[in-house]
Design a protein with these regions (language model features):
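Catalytic-core signature of thiol
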Residues: 23-150
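Bacterial Sec-dependent N-terminal signal peptides
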Residues: 1-23
Length: 150
């Protein structure tokens, strides 16, 4: 008798567990659905890798996309041209100030406009900044060498 009641209890418990399972028809939550209202042309995203030059990449991206907005053709401007001349001017100023200012990698978006006004601008194909067999920008060694040299 005890075995039968234990068996019936176990069977009823299992049937409740089986009936408590979710059905396949349960609603699946959807993620956000975005609707394009207006699609603007943009230049492709570029990889700065490990160069500490996000300021140059973002400033150049701003200029390239603004040219597209104005109806000009797409152009790929050189980020490393800006970095080169910005670092050169920083080094000259650092020496003139007898080391009494900050000299390190990095900069600001305003540096892009400064270099553009003073030195002009060139396309990426003219000056890509990769001259030692590397396929991406890695400025850790450059930053250390330039700092010790200056």
């Amino acid at each position: 008798m005890l075995k039968k009641s234990l068996f019936v209890t176990l069977l009823s418990f299992c049937s409740v567990c089986i009936l408590a399972q979710e059905t396949d028809t349960a609603k699946v939550k959807k993620g956000y659905e975005f609707t394009d209202i207006k699609v603007l042309k943009t230049t492709p995203v570029k990889d700065q890798d490990r160069s500490g030059t996000c300021w140059s990449f973002s400033g150049i991206g701003l200029i390239e996309n603004e040219l597209l907005r104005m109806g000009k053709p797409e152009i790929d401007l050189s980020e490393m041209f800006v970095v080169r001349y910005c670092y050169l001017d920083k080094a000259i100023k650092y020496v003139r100030m007898h080391g009494e200012m900050n000299f390190s990698g990095g900069g600001g978006v305003s540096d892009v406009f400064y270099v553009m006004k003073k030195y002009g601008m060139v396309p990426e194909e003219v000056y890509n900044g990769l001259h030692y067999g590397t396929d991406s920008h890695k400025h850790g060694e450059l930053d250390a060498v330039v700092k010790s040299y200056i």
